[in-house]
């Protein structure tokens, strides 16, 4: 196993009980990925304990985690979310053998077809003057938050969607395009796209009364996950098991500020890693100035590094005369 000894709050998180929900928020470079991997090994080595899933969003991080781990235990599985999702739906007989998931380009095509179909029915509606890309983005927003119907979408706060200003009374037109998109997709024999896969996993888990495969699930880089991804993983944990969320919510990813509070996680407290072992103080101070600017959406969950271990030169700012340089 990697030769790193947890320190301070890291050590406290390692010692937490193997049950319930745990949330760990930290700055970049505070050791979240390392502790996620160490905790996964710890849980996998509990005598007579269950299986452990360490899940992240991208394949590159999966390869990195496997590369620095020397564990061959069948009890520890490291994979990205979409592999978990496809595997689960497949074992439930809900994943087509070929071409079951639309590619991003195919999704854009079917959204465009849906837009034209609804627009033809309401040619004077100004909402349909927006671009096809706008509708793709808004439908993705609907999918990632897993709204159960139009009512939930109508009432939803525009988290991370300030740039896509939509009056509530006009949301019905977007939802009509969304429903038409689903209709066209299903008619073509394509049940899922990459953005609503988690929605179907969650719904399938609601109807699944068989024993859960994993006793413990650990999410690393949780800020990369949509709310529906998190909700599905929370529901995939066996009764009496644990769910651990490691996230850097100081990052703005997907245009949506993922809050663990909106994702089905029930934690009594938040553990915070605020010691930066990677970036020098000069870089951290520069990043802090950016987060305090008008260009950055403020968030109460953001963790500010209080200590920097590394030292280094000040960052160099380069200004160009135009965007083409």
Please identify what each model-predicted range represents:
Residues 27-28, 151-156, 190-199:
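Short coil/turn segments at secondary-structure boundaries
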């Amino acid at each position: 196993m990697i030769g790193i000894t947890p320190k301070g709050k890291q050590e406290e998180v390692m010692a937490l009980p193997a049950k319930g929900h745990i949330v760990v928020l930290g700055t970049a470079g505070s050791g979240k990925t390392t502790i996620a991997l160490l905790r996964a090994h710890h849980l996998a080595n509990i005598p007579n304990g269950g299986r452990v899933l360490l899940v992240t969003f991208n394949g590159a991080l999966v390869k990195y985690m496997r590369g620095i781990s020397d564990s061959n235990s069948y009890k520890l599985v490291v994979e990205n979310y979409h592999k978990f999702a496809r595997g689960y739906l497949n074992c439930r007989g809900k994943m087509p053998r070929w071409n079951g998931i639309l590619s991003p380009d195919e999704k854009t095509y079917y959204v465009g077809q849906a837009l034209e179909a609804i627009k033809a029915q309401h040619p004077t509606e100004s909402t349909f003057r927006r671009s096809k890309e706008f509708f793709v983005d808004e439908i993705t927003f609907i999918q990632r938050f897993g709204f159960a119907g139009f009512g939930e979408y109508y009432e939803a706060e525009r988290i991370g969607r300030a740039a896509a200003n939509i009056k509530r009374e006009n949301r019905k037109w977007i939802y009509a395009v969304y429903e038409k998109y689903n209709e066209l997709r299903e008619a073509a024999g394509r049940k899922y796209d990459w953005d609503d896969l988690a929605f179907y996993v969650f719904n399938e888990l609601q109807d699944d009364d068989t024993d859960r495969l994993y006793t413990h699930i650990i999410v690393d880089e949780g800020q990369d996950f949509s709310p529906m991804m998190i909700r599905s993983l929370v529901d995939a944990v066996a009764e009496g098991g644990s769910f651990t969320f490691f996230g850097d919510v100081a990052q703005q990813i997907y245009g949506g500020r993922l809050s663990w509070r909106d994702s089905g996680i029930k934690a009594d407290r938040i553990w915070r890693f605020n010691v930066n072992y990677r970036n020098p103080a000069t870089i951290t101070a520069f990043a802090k100035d950016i987060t305090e600017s008008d260009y950055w959406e403020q968030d109460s969950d953001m963790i500010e590094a209080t200590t920097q271990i590394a030292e280094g030169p000040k960052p160099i700012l380069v200004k160009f005369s135009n965007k083409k340089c």
